[in-house]
Design a protein with these regions (language model features):
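The catalytic-center signature of Zn2+-dependent metalloproteases
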Residues: 128-214, 221
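Short linear, low-complexity motifs centered on an aromatic residue
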Residues: 203, 215-247
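General "foldedness" signal
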Residues: 74, 212, 225-228, 289-291
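Substrate-binding/catalytic groove segments of enzymes
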Residues: 150-151, 219-223, 285-288
């Protein structure tokens, strides 16, 4: 990165020196140089809001060309734009202006190349995940999974990157699902010091729904972690894995003791979320044949999936709202 700054803080602007000079600005300016192509997610967000209203909770971006993400280190990713919720393991912050939003936007999801996803959104293709499960995890990162337990320094529930559930965490508890899109697994206690993962990545668990503001704390069943397990907490969800260790029971009160209660509570929290599905093409190119139809199929199925995965407690809208 090459730039110049007047000192003492102030605004910062990225430029394309070849195309945008001369320019008059009041703060620092710079241009970023790289040895390989990348995606400017904030530029995508700003471009979107130049034509559409600031009336979206999530922007969900798909690329119509091959592109590695984060140097090949991610299949898809999410980054938070704004958080005002307390008691979910996240700081309070607002970076909306950088994304072109002055109010509602909370999350940016980068799904990567559309071509790497199966045409059938319910086909399992990435470990135990379908396209809908991947989308469930990435949009779910707006709230999940960052909870500590017992006290604010205990990450026993957490696995990969401290933002997914621990493989050894029975993330569904006694709930109706087979694990959580946020990882962890549905674990059977064999009663002899061994445990077996019996299901995984199946929508949102009761604990997830509590964190999302869709379920009161009183409706979250007890859960447990297999303490001392030989399985890496960051391991990808899998079915049929045997673990050995001690059962450590967890209640929602143990989590609230560490994080405090969720504010706003489920009684006052948002239940309907608007998400924009965005297809990005290379400059000057039309979408690939079939891409728009494929993405629209995903969009339509996602609205159904989200409602099902939240046990009918949450709703997604995907309509476009012009400025």
């Amino acid at each position: 990165m090459v730039g110049i700054a007047p000192g003492d803080g102030g605004p910062f602007k990225l430029l394309d020196y070849q195309a945008e000079l001369p320019v008059t600005v009041s703060g620092a300016v710079a241009e970023q140089f790289a040895t390989r192509s990348g995606i400017d997610d904030l530029a995508i967000a700003n471009m979107f809001f130049s034509g559409f209203a600031d009336d979206y909770d999530h922007l969900v971006v798909w690329l119509d060309f091959p592109q590695t993400l984060l140097g090949g280190g991610a299949f898809a990713y999410e980054f938070g734009i704004k958080n005002e919720i307390r008691g979910i393991g996240q700081q309070i912050f607002d970076a909306g202006r950088e994304a072109g939003s002055r109010g509602r936007l909370r999350s940016f999801v980068q799904m990567g190349s559309l071509s790497k996803y199966r045409s059938n959104p319910d086909e399992t293709f990435l470990g135990t995940n379908t396209t809908m499960d991947v989308l469930g995890q990435e949009t779910g990162h707006r709230w999940l999974a960052f909870l500590r337990v017992h006290d604010a320094t205990n990450p026993a529930l957490l696995g990969r990157a401290l933002s997914h559930w621990n493989f050894n965490f029975d993330s569904d508890g006694d709930g109706p699902r087979g694990g959580s899109d946020m990882e962890g697994t549905n674990i059977r206690d064999n009663g002899d010091g061994s445990f077996t993962s019996v299901a995984a990545t199946d929508g949102f668990s009761p604990l997830d729904l509590y964190v999302m503001g869709l379920l009161p704390a009183s409706d979250v069943p007890n859960m447990f972690v297999v303490g001392g397990s030989e399985v890496d907490p960051g391991a990808a969800p899998a079915i049929g894995t045997i673990m050995h260790g001690s059962r450590e029971d967890i209640s929602i009160n143990d989590i609230i003791r560490a994080e405090g209660p969720r504010v706003p509570s489920s009684a006052a929290a948002q239940k309907t979320f608007r998400m924009a599905f965005i297809l990005v093409t290379k400059d000057g190119q039309a979408p690939q044949p079939g891409s728009v139809e494929k993405l629209d199929r995903f969009r339509t199925r996602w609205m159904e999936y989200f409602n099902q995965a939240t046990d009918g407690l949450g709703t997604v809208e995907t309509n476009l709202v012009p400025r």
